[in-house]
């Protein structure tokens, strides 16, 4: 199929019996460029689009090309009719890809420069032909939103779609999601989906597919590899891990955080090790941690959230009246504090917290340090906060604690029952044992 190419480029491909998806080699001057021929959406009829071995896409002008050689035909062509059947019948797929937004599954419209989602199974396979080498996939666009617009009601819809996907016979689920709030959604799904039949893999892209340094292809291939081969039944985040494009890491969904605004390896496990490493070129999953939740027989759905919760990042000079207003003049049922150090705020607020907990409002303490756990028994202020009813939340990340609280509030009304659930390790959100290697050390040599 050369239908996306025109004029001279089309004639060259037709004469050589080269089709989209074939592995070819182009000689231009002293350069030899090898890669998979992709569809071209450019108005320039002299451009070939090639996917390199490192996952990047490049455009090559036909001008001054001395040789074009077919290396191997597209191995997925033989699977084309089967793939079309898969797209019509999700039950025949192995891996379900659910798109919620972001640029991880997208295609460039070169006429406008715009990037739009690849909406169908065929488009995803066209975008990434290698995916057929891993598993049969079926794609669904649940919604297409910017991740900063994610809401608890959307978490419920995603969880329902995951449950449905497993019910259709899929053995793993990949969720395409914007990176900014991916960790929140991962936590929400972890609390909402229990006894998972297989992996639920959230994946995103830090750089869209129209950029030469895009991580879209590597991340999606890695995510499908994880969904196909992982032995666990957990919600995880699968993202790029190194600047050399050699592997991706699989992070437990309740122990991961986006730690850089733009780097491709922005996601890091916090107070925990990654569960696995994905060698995407080899289509291989290497387990790094054996303490995972095994796959179960049938997935249980329990997706309810009460968003009458608030995440407070404490800072010196926090206005007492402002805090009092939040605790007394709103519908708030729970407060998560990102406190300093071992879990502190100014002692000026102790009595406010005491009154709030007596009124049935849950107050939980996490640390702004992120790494390490809270220990409110060490210093006087911490002990005062404990006496006022503030609950220490071990090594939980502030965002995870917030999502967990929303889930707990939707299930319990009694403060003591809420406290009991919040300090219980439900899905691996609390790591009872920290080792020295859990803290990253930066080298300045």
From Swiss-Prot:
Annotated GO MF terms: asparaginase activity; ATP binding; glutaminyl-tRNA synthase (glutamine-hydrolyzing) activity
Catalytic reaction equation(s): L-glutamyl-tRNA(Gln) + L-glutamine + ATP + H2O = L-glutaminyl-tRNA(Gln) + L-glutamate + ADP + phosphate + H(+)
Active-site residue list: 103, 179-180, 258
Record-level GO BP terms: amino acid metabolic process; regulation of translational fidelity; translation
EC number annotated for this UniProt entry: 6.3.5.-
Top-level lineage group: Archaea
Start and end residues of each Asparaginase/glutaminase domain: 93-425
Disulphides: none
Alphabetical UniProt keywords: ATP-binding, Ligase, Nucleotide-binding, Protein biosynthesis
Gene3D superfamilies: 2.30.30.520, 3.40.50.40, L-asparaginase, N-terminal domain
Enzyme class, UniProt record, top EC level: ligase
Pfam families: Asparaginase, Asparaginase_C, GatD_N
Subunit: Heterodimer of GatD and GatE.
HAMAP family in UniProt: GatD (MF_00586)
NCBIfam families in the cross-refs: asnASE_I, gatD_arch, PRK04183.1
Function: Allows the formation of correctly charged Gln-tRNA(Gln) through the transamidation of misacylated Glu-tRNA(Gln) in organisms which lack glutaminyl-tRNA synthetase. The reaction takes place in the presence of glutamine and ATP through an activated gamma-phospho-Glu-tRNA(Gln). The GatDE system is specific for glutamate and does not act on aspartate.
Entry's family note: Belongs to the asparaginase 1 family. GatD subfamily.
The protein, known as: Glutamyl-tRNA(Gln) amidotransferase subunit D
Gene name tied to this protein: gatD
